[in-house]
Amino acid sequence: MVMHARKPQRMNDGYFEKHTSHTSYQSSKYSSSKRDYERDRSSNYRDRDLSPGAGGGGGGGSAGGGGGGSGNGGGPLNNGNSYRSQSPDIDSPSSRSHDLRDRSDHRGGGGGNGRGGSGERYSFMQKMRDRDRDVYKKDKYSDKRDRRGNDRDSESSYRTNHDRDRRGGGGSGGGSGKLCSSRENDKRSGSDDRDRDRDRDLRDLRDKRDRGSDRDRDMYKKDKYADKRERSDRGERTARYGDWSEHVSSSGKMYYYNCKTEISQWEKPKEWVDRERNLPRDQHREKDYRDKDRDRDRDDRFSRSTYKHSNSSRDNSRLRWNYDNDGGPPSHRRRLDGRHNDNADMDISGDSTPTSEASYSLSGTPTTHGGGPGGGGPGGGGGSNSDQPMGNALPRLSSHPTANSSASVATGTGATGGLHYGSGTGGGPVTGATMLPTMSGMLNSNSSNSAGGSSSNASSSSLRNSVVGHIGSTSGTTVPTLGSQDPHQHHLNSNAPLPPGAKGKDQALLMRQKMHLGLGVLDVQSHHGVNSVGSVSDGTNHAYNSVNNSVSGSLRDNSVNSPLYMHHSMSPSLNFTKSPIPTIVGHTNNMSIAYTCNPPFGLKATLDGGVMVANASPATPGGNASSGSSGANSSQSIVPGMGPVCGISVITSMGSNSGTLCEGPPTPTQELDLSGSALEQQQLAAAAAAATASSLQLQAAQQAQQQRKLDGTSSATLSSLQSCVSSSGQAANLRGPEISPKLAKYFRADLIAHVTNWHAEVLERQAQKCCEDTHLFGDITCTRICAELKCARSLVRSTEINATLQEQKIMYLRHQIRRIEESKTQNAFMSDDT
């Protein structure tokens, strides 16, 4: 029997180390098929190797399918071609195993005569198995293919010849010796199989570990390469802003290069720093704009839905706006008005407010009731007014004129605040086409006010005009607003229902009409009734006490459930560009920086551009007003058509110092409508108010020297600095913190009412103004000094240059003198010689 030397397996010849990039591909390509192939073959052959020992002694029955009687049945198939296929299509692990199985079956059938050729047959199968494994190892590498083809040819020829010789000589031999040798070979092959399985497991583990290390090495190389490439890309991408670009020096430090001026510097340019500082703010502003747009869309949808809902609940007894005549709901009227701006509105219905319908009406539908009889005093000619239909009293569009109606003007003594006035009535026609009130009735009422005051009915309302500024971009604008100190006073467009017998609604309507129509000049004649109460000598005490009166009256009033009626629209049309919700930021105690005039004053109220200018003029003191319960020291001026006016205040910050003292629940949002025409008027008004406020500030500076604690020199300096500041700068200083129109609708003064209008705020603002002026003066002085220093440096340099030139001249002249003297001595010596 020919024994072929077994070729040792190639465990690790460095191929994977040389070809690390293809490790995963090769291992995945061959490892699984190789393991399955070897496992199947080892299991099949192990089963077949053990079978001849059991069946070989019983007449030569083999492990195959052929029995003893059909011993020669497989002979015709036992040619050499059935062992090894030369076609590459069938040369697969499965085809090889099938071929070997068939081979064993045929060979078992051929040896069925009991002559016992099985031992040699199985030892030969062991050799064949080793040879096939070697050939399979060779298949892994492409450079072995030609050699593999030659090996196959030689193997097939060897096998066919050897098997043919084996088969030919197998018929006549001793079976017992061959059977023993087959058993010995079976034992040896079983131990070899176990060793091979162990070697194969170790090899698989080693291959798996090598594959993992190769994969880690590949990943490390890939990450390092990617990192290097990214670093190079980052180096190629130089940061630029404007003309400046950022570079890295050889020492690794960043420097900045200007391509225009060709200047390099270590410091980051100023515009670069400003851009980095403003970048998050710009991003935040863009986000705010997106949020505002989303809120505006949601508010529009909400207003439409709430308007539909409020239309469905119109069956109560209160009178409402006739939207059919007025041009639709507030949002539609705003759009029809043609002055729709970016400021989003939100029509708050009664369903959206945290109140019940029983105590608060829908804000989209202003409510009112007829006024009851008003009792007059002994000298007041106590007349009574009958109930007045709301259709005649409500303000209408100029295109919808109404019939003339008697305007009931009732001013009486307020039960709170210590402000007592006489009550009187006067009738005057109010034409709906122009809404210009006739002043005669109100003059009569004012003349009757001086007749009787203390004994008038407490149920009539005391109206008070406080000069407050608009909260929008023109805080210098001073417009009159009506405040309520009486429980029976009801503001139009408030959330609280009007109790029966309330007075003063007509005068509130007239005031609103004046404000909305933007009259050129309010017809104020020389009929001023001044009720002086207590000491009126000190202007500062006058301002403080008027604040005290308002605050005390508002705190005792528990039925004022809303802020004032809307005063924000100074447009010539009466179209409500917003919903009729009271969007008010001030109450009767709006006393910001109190630039007080002397106590006897009149009010020349002009509405040129919506500005009320207060002039100090002698008023006619008169009237017999009784002393109030709170002991107020306030100066009051009864202006026809406007009610009694207490104090003059100019608001200089945009709503931060105007508070609304209201005990009822306010509306969820108090928005501001700055329409186009109103915005232009208020911008014009800001400049005029700035000039007025500057003059008033000078008066306040003269009256409050003990507060400013400044000597005459600094006061003169500060007053001279006013000329250095432009009117826009003054307006900016007057306005205080800037609030954009889009943010103004989120402002609610009632939320800060508890920290506003304190006495210390006046002093604080004056001190702040003084501090700002001082800083401005210091800046101007520093600028002047810096300029002088530069001039002085230039003079020093020019003087040094002149001195150097002078020294050069002196040296030159000395040198010339020396040469001349030498030449003179030489000439004298020569003359002596001659």
Curated annotation (Swiss-Prot):
Disruption phenotype: Neurodegeneration, slow growth, decreased starvation-induced autophagy, increased basal autophagy and decreased mTor activity. RNAi-mediated knockdown in neurons results in impaired habituation during a light-off jump reflex habituation assay where flies are exposed to a series of sudden light-off pulses and measured each time for a jump response. Mutants fail to adapt their behavior and retain high average jump response throughout the experiment in contrast to controls which quickly habituate to the repeated light-off stimuli. One of its GO terms (molecular function) is chromatin binding. The keyword Transit peptide does not apply. SMART domains: WW (SM00456). One of its GO terms (cellular component) is lysosome. Residues 244-271 form the WW domain. This is WW domain-containing adapter protein with coiled-coil homolog.
